[in-house]
Structures are given as structure tokens and as C-alpha cells.
């Protein structure tokens, strides 16, 4: 089974591209969604995180703002949180792989926003970077509610620059020319990979 790592900076269209892979029948593992599920009421992270960070659970779920207040800017607290969450996400991901394999899928996608920043490229076979021109990215991001130019710049400062991501990618999906163009690229990429696997 071929594992594709899908990543891209904020506003590049990664979520939309991820959905395009799903529409083509490729299972997609969404790392952010996995963490949300772990933090939700009944999630496996709720009890251990509350033990480590008392007061962060509200109505049976982890309140991300309260957790953030205890963790941001505190590398020791962040390391403690990661020691709880990362193994749970890892177990969740293994379950995803096992199910995809049992269903006979040849290709799966791991949707990981900070793929390069967390060393995730070592866990995948090929890296797909979603990209768009900087002015398109800026326009998309600043159209979001609650977003300011300052917030946008702060987010960019924490992410690997787009040019670096593209240079390290095996494949690039350009979303700057519209959805149909991006969808064609996704289909062409899957055709290429499936042909290579059956050759």
C-alpha cells in the first residue's frame, strides 16, 4: 500500500484537495480530525489530559482554549501534552491503515498540515504539496472570519515556506487555477501512481 503525505501552508487549498482524493475513492487520514476526536466527549485523550492539566475539561470534552492557555509558550507542558496525544494519534493511524488494507486499497493519503515541521515525511512513501501563488493564498486567508494580516504573518512564520515545501515534494498540486484544474491534477497523479504500481 502506497502512503501519500498531503501537506500545504495555510490558504493553499489542502482541505479541498484532500476531499478530491476522497472523491476519487482514496481513504484519507486527517491528523487534525483525529486530534479533535480524541479531545471530544468520550475521546481517549480526555482523562489523561485532565489528569496532567487539571481544569481543561468542560462538559466531558477538552476545552482547547483552556488547554492552550496552559501549554502555549511552555515547552515542558507542550512536551507533556505531546507525550499523551502522539501515541493515541499513532494508534488511531494504525487502525486507519489496517482498515484500508483490509478493504484492499492500493493508495492512502495522510493529511498532515505540519508534515515537514514534524518530520512526518519519514512516515510516508511520497509527499504531495498543495500550493498556490502567494497573492492567491493571502486573499483566501484574509477572507476568513477573525483573520488579520498580523495573525496570518504569525502563522506563516511557524510554517515551512511554500518554496521549500515545493522543493522537497515528490508532487505538487497547484490550486491557483481553479478547482477543475486541481481535480485534473489529482486524477492524473492517481493514474500515474496506479500505473506505476501495476507495471
From Swiss-Prot:
InterPro entries according to UniProt: Depp_CoAkinase (IPR001977), P-loop_NTPase (IPR027417)
Binding site for ATP: 11-16
A GO biological-process term: coenzyme A biosynthetic process
Annotated ranges, domain DPCK: 3-199
Enzymatic reactions: 3'-dephospho-CoA + ATP = ADP + CoA + H(+)
Protein name from the UniProt record: Dephospho-CoA kinase
GO molecular function per UniProt: ATP binding; dephospho-CoA kinase activity
HAMAP family per record: Dephospho_CoA_kinase
Pathway: Cofactor biosynthesis; coenzyme A biosynthesis; CoA from (R)-pantothenate: step 5/5
Keyword match Calcium: no
Keyword set includes Hydrolase: no
SUPFAM superfamilies, A to Z: P-loop containing nucleoside triphosphate hydrolases
Free-text function comment from the UniProt entry: Catalyzes the phosphorylation of the 3'-hydroxyl group of dephosphocoenzyme A to form coenzyme A.
GO cellular component entries: cytoplasm
Originating species: Caulobacter vibrioides (strain ATCC 19089 / CIP 103742 / CB 15) (Caulobacter crescentus)
Localization (cell): Cytoplasm
Keywords: ATP-binding, Coenzyme A biosynthesis, Cytoplasm, Kinase, Nucleotide-binding, Transferase
Pfam family, one: CoaE
E.C. number(s) listed in UniProt: 2.7.1.24
